[in-house]
Regions:
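Gram-negative bacterial Sec-dependent N-terminal signal peptides
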Residues: 1-19
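Sequence/structural signature of beta-propeller domains
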Residues: 20-442
Length: 442
């Protein structure tokens, strides 16, 4: 096991990270880690929060792509911009940014869940699809067969889908576009075979298998194997089970009762003793490794459901292996928030969303006060852990949450949303690196 270089005694109080002055993280998004979370920069100044809400490294800029001034889907309430993706393939590839909106029926009057679209060339933003029975739309991904998959993060459905009326939790949907036009919706179908769950992360491998999670404090990780590539109407859903009752080590995918999975996949997973993790949220695949953000995981005490969180790695081989890739106290500090005049310790807490960086690094954003964005290096020494986890950005908007981190075609630009902002103006932003003309590569 990697030596615990970040385990700090309770008496230590630091606001900066010890490596901030010594490290340069290379790649297209080359950066010097920022010194600390935005504890000292927290503000309610609307001018700042609507223009430069992030503390970012030198050599980077931040700008708004779309906010509620050019598209206000839910007047009088936050739009809850959540996940991002672009049309990654096909005609006009890279031109359109799609977003889910994590709005729930508790707001009134409820106008229904929505997917919006931003033309990255013109800046025009519009609703792509909206339906009165959609709740808390969250996960979103562009498929290799040029459709969108999106899903509801719902534990107990208040507005059942008319085509899946017995489902007890959230559903996953597939949006199909008109031929050669990624701005026109041709059809939207519910995909109950992928389970009724509190969905968030969605990932797809080279074989067309789809991975999903259940965002429960005892949530499982799932794999759907379709009968035919690109056809999600039939197939088998599996849940991940680590052998010998452990959380890490050799694992297997266990087939679920498909009738039960379409009603409540959580119950189906529990019936086969699938391994539970504390609030699995987003998923990201890099090569043959699937990463999962575990928001409240305690890697030391599995009974604790209020842990600091961790990043899990699952190898997508014939015999999967499961390990903690980012673990507070091992390769990143624990966070200790400042109290009154006592300074805090900048650290890792409540990881939520993940993104594959342009050079294969894993990007992580927290669901936490002063949401931090971290970058985890690959595990080159093969000990299971990232070889380094570095602080890229931190949010000055304390009541808000950074979410939906995503890289499109431009390797120098990170998309990120800000939801439930102090300003009441939820937004989608781009954080970009200024590339010098003298650079021939990174």
């Amino acid at each position: 096991m990697k030596k615990s270089i970040f385990a700090l005694p309770a008496c230590v109080a630091l606001t900066t990270l010890v490596y901030a002055d010594a490290i340069l993280v290379n790649g297209p998004m080359k950066f010097k880690p920022i010194a600390a979370s935005a504890y000292q920069q927290t503000t309610t100044d609307q001018l700042i929060l609507n223009s430069e809400p992030w503390v970012i490294p030198g050599g980077f800029t931040q700008r708004i792509i779309s906010d509620e001034s050019n598209l206000d889907i839910y007047p009088g309430a936050s739009d809850w911009n959540d996940m991002n993706t672009i049309n990654e393939t096909g005609k006009y590839a890279g031109q359109y940014l799609y977003r889910t909106h994590e709005v729930r029926p508790s707001i009134g009057p409820y106008l229904g869940g929505a997917i919006s679209m931003v033309d990255l060339k013109t800046g025009k933003a519009q609703v792509l699809a909206q339906r009165s029975d959609w709740e808390a739309l969250d996960g979103l991904i562009w498929t290799p067969w040029q459709t969108l998959l999106f899903a509801e993060e719902v534990f107990a459905a208040q507005l059942p889908d008319p085509d899946a009326p017995n489902a007890q939790s959230g559903m996953l949907y597939e949006l199909k576009f008109a031929k050669n036009d990624p701005t026109v919706v041709e059809e939207i179908e519910v995909r109950p075979m992928l389970g009724s769950l509190a969905h968030e992360g969605i990932e797809i491998d080279e074989e067309g298998n789809v991975y999903v999670i259940d965002e429960d404090r005892k949530g499982a990780i799932y794999k759907f194997v379709p009968d035919n590539f690109g056809d999600l109407s039939s197939g088998q859903l599996y849940a991940l089970r680590v052998k010998n009752g452990a959380k890490t080590g050799e694992a297997e995918w266990i087939a679920l009762d498909m009738n039960q999975a379409q009603i409540n996949a959580r119950i189906a997973a529990q019936a086969v003793n699938a391994t539970s993790f504390c609030r699995p949220e987003d998923l990201e695949r890099i090569g043959r490794t699937l990463y999962a953000a575990l928001t409240c995981e305690d890697a030391v005490n599995s009974a604790n459901t209020t842990g600091p969180g961790a990043i899990l790695a699952v190898s997508l081989e014939s015999v999967p292996r499961v390990s903690y890739f980012v673990q507070p106290g091992i390769n990143v500090p624990f966070e200790i928030r400042p109290v009154d005049t006592i300074p805090g310790v900048t650290g890792f807490k409540s990881p939520d969303n993940l993104a594959k960086g342009p050079d294969g690094k894993l990007w992580i954003v927290e669901d936490n006060d002063n949401s931090d964005i971290w970058v985890a290096l690959p595990d080159e020494d093969e000990d299971g852990y990232s070889d380094g986890v570095y602080l890229f950005a931190s949010l000055k908007d304390k009541t808000a949450e950074g979410t939906g981190i995503y890289f499109g075609e431009d390797p120098y630009t990170l998309f990120v949303n800000i939801q439930h902002s102090e300003t009441g103006n939820d937004k989608t932003m781009a954080i970009s690196r200024k590339k010098h003309k003298s650079e021939s590569g990174d």
